[in-house]
Amino acid sequence: MNKGNDKLVERLRSNTERGSILWRLVRPVVRPVWSLIHNRDYVSNYDRDYYLYHSCVLPPRELRGRLGVSFLADGFYLESGIAEARRLAARLAYSKSSLVVDIGCGLGRLATGMLWEFGDVQYFGIDSNPTFAEWCQEHIERNHPSFRFIHLDVVNELYNPTGKIDGDRIRLPLADATADIVYLWGLFTNMGPEHVRIYVSEMSRIAREGSRIFLTAFVEENVPEVSFIPKGYVPYECVKPLQCVRYSKEFLFSIFSRYGLVVEEFRHHGGAFPSQSEVYLRKEKVAA
């Protein structure tokens, strides 16, 4: 990444760490209100179901709060999306002809950053949360049709517990070898190993030969292959097993290798969020 974006990411990381510390201090007082916001059902007839910030359409804070307390701040949400868009150009060989596939796109944070940086380009976002996908379709895709969003009704304990598709039967709605960049921010941090294997297989299937893949995960050396909510690992409260899933580096990297994905760079705890590591992959070219 370029130096300017590195500084932006570092500032976002510092803000996240400070926010996590502050949240631990004030949580006993505000937790009832936070629980209400976090668990409330989305109502489509809000007087205003979006925010305008520096001429950008942002999701309402009621929805952003479900992704993490840091995203409640308009500036943080937008700047973090811009930083991720710049990562595409600086590290993942992005060009305006690239098709970017965002698996676990949430509320379109990357898409918002891409619109800021690049304008109307090719983007395909997938998420298991129907409310998130609906908001993106209404407020991003509707005005920018080259940005497409779909709801994949796969079961997810955190975001879509009533889903109809089991993760073992997942197939991404894209043809083989169509994606130039596959992006998975924070997906494997909340996913068990049986489903990680399926998603790695699928992202390898849809990626073109030589294409780039970026993801974040909780990864450490000299730890068990898989740990659900390892004690003291993240600075926020976890009450469900999938709120923090940590992998051993050897175990996770062996899955990548099995499906023809080469690790180009691993940045331990390099992400803007506590304990998340960054992994840069390349889809191997098949020898003629």
What kind of region is each of these model predictions?
Residues N2-R91, K96, L107-M114, Q122-R171, ...:
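Class I (Rossmann-like) S-adenosyl-L-methionine-dependent methyltransferase catalytic domain
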Residues G104:
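Conserved S-adenosyl-L-methionine
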Residues Y183:
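A conserved beta-strand element that flanks and buttresses the S-adenosyl-L-methionine
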Residues G186-L187:
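Short catalytic micro-motifs in class I SAM-dependent methyltransferases
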Residues G192-P193:
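Helix-capping/helix-break motifs at membrane-protein junctions
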Residues R197-E209:
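A short glycine-rich, Lys/Arg-flanked "PGG" loop and its adjoining helix->strand segment in the class I
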